[in-house]
Amino acid sequence: MPYRLKLPEAEVLGVGKFKNSQGHTECAEFIRQATNAPSTPVWKKGRKVSEANLGDILRGTAIATFDDADRYPTDALGRHAAIYLSHTSGGISVLDQWNAQGEVKPRLIQFNKPKGTSRSNDGSTFFVIE
């Protein structure tokens, strides 16, 4: 079962709205608070966004990167989670946050980035969270 945004999109935008207990604006914390998803070790790898037909993934669905063991990564190759808005052949439109950014904002994550690009910045590495 995919996790979906529980708030209107306009209400998630802004500085510091989704902080963890240490005051950090991590991507996974945004997903947990905005969708009621469990903690990352429980996340399951669903449909690959880049292989989905337009309309197969509903706007507001939680997506994330997963490693070769089908888990949310803990290695140095990058990890990220976001809210899916839409996608084209070029990339995924998302709402996301991370510590350095400090707020939820829309962003385009392109597909098929060069080898060595962090998973966080390659749309080809994102899957629906189940």
What are these language model-derived features?
Residues M1-L77:
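Secreted/periplasmic proteins that engage bacterial cell-wall peptidoglycan
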Residues T74-H87:
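Short beta-strand-centered aromatic/proline hotspots
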Residues Y3-K17, L85-E130:
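Aromatic- and glycine-rich peptidoglycan recognition patches
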Residues R59, H80, E103-R107:
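Secondary-structure boundary/capping motif
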Residues F30, I63, A81-Y84, V94:
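Generic hydrophobic secondary-structure signal
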